[in-house]
Amino acid sequence: MPSNKAGIIPRLCLRSAFPSFPVSPLNERPMSSALRPSACPGLLRIVQALDGGICRIKLNGGSITAVQADIVASAAERFASGVIEATNRANLQIRGIGSTHGPLIDSLMASGLGPTTAAGDDVRNLMLSPGAGIDRTMLFDTRPLAERILDTLQGNARFHDLSAKFAVQLDGGESLAMLEHPHDLWLSAFEQDGEKRWAFGLAGCPTDTSAGSVALNDGHALVVAVLDMFLEVARPEQTRMRHLLAEHSREILLNRLAERLSIQAMTDWRRTLDSRPLHIGAHPQAEAGVVYVGAVPPLGRLDPVMLRGAAQLAARFGDGTLRFTPWQSLLLPTVRNEDAAEVIRSLERMGLFCDPDQSLTRMIACTGSSGCSKSLAETKGDALQMAALLKRHGQVLNVHLSGCSRSCAAAHIAPVTLLAVAPGHYDLYFRDAAQPGFGALHARHLTIEAVAALLDARSRSPLDA
């Protein structure tokens, strides 16, 4: 079963955590000796894989300036293989890094993309909607609160004891939101009797039943209270909220929280999921006359030319920023209506997809056996073959190819999952809420051709539910 991923949050440099303009660089890199052992890559911790080192660049709110994006592209060219990945937590990764890490790290730190302390890099994981502050249906602009949370956690060494996988989600009610990634704590804005509040839950998603609600002004206090409670109650081996809930009832934990701030019981609310592919193509923003343009790199991978080109478009036609998304894609915000078509044409010429009817926009695949020793198949290549076969059949399906059971490329359960069992062969699962893990096992040891034929036949069957 896919593991719940990521850690928690502090703040970046002496600047806004959500920049829309070039930033001042840090004067020096945090001391690497303060890094704790972890298998998770970071900006300061380069983790080795079969294809070289991996550097994970955590983006506050998924946002990066055009200047910073150009620096990332140059770093990938100069110090690595040129492979840049958009992750399912709206971050970036550089792959194929050589044995000398210092110049790459220094260039990224100087751009303002790193933490202020080495310990802070592991725990700055706060996921927002890619449409934060610009979505037409948002109830609350989450960016100021997110920046405040990042400030607090970066400045409080106590929160650096959280696992590097501990995760928080802040949902402002946007239509463009990934609501299927489990988090240790989630907050979701809603309106009740004319009052805006935060619904929240522990170890789950906003589409789950909420645990309670707090006043809109208490969002920051709630996050701090939950993290304090977790660190007080959890034993060292209990690194995630789900571990705590396996031993303590939700009611007990909520009672402890109620000692710290006013919580209203609420177990009959859950967030409605908008299943439209709003991260692809041009969509109106809250501000009249402008749109954001969403583009998907093939299987989440960009090369330096793609990233640099998108950054140049953002500087010329947008607000000078790019926003990365949990769908391993990117947005160019604040493009004038009359410029959207030209931006889309330019992105497509670079090799990005802006049409949700293209098969590769719905495909997810991990690194595969060429880059990961745990993968049993070359998932990227197999995904390209699958997309071509589905296109031939006129099918556009959400399919996840995983080289092993860890499901690194997807934090949620896809409608269709192919789990590698040997090179070019997969077990086929269909999502089923009643089944654990990837869902219901439908067939074993299938080739890509066999999977495509089966999916095509299934889509045409009148008996298919």
How would you label these PLM feature ranges?
Residues 271-292:
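Active-site cores of enzymes that catalyze phosphoryl transfer or operate on phosphate-rich substrates
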Residues 27-33, 52-195, 213-217, 221, ...:
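Small-residue-enriched alpha-helical segments and adjacent helix-cap loops
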Residues 162, 166-247, 412, 417-465:
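Mobile "lid/hinge" segments at catalytic clefts and subdomain interfaces of large enzymes
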Residues 82-86, 159-163, 231-255, 260-277, ...:
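Flexible, glycine/charged-enriched surface loops at secondary-structure junctions
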Residues 18-21:
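Aromatic (phenylalanine/tyrosine) cluster motif
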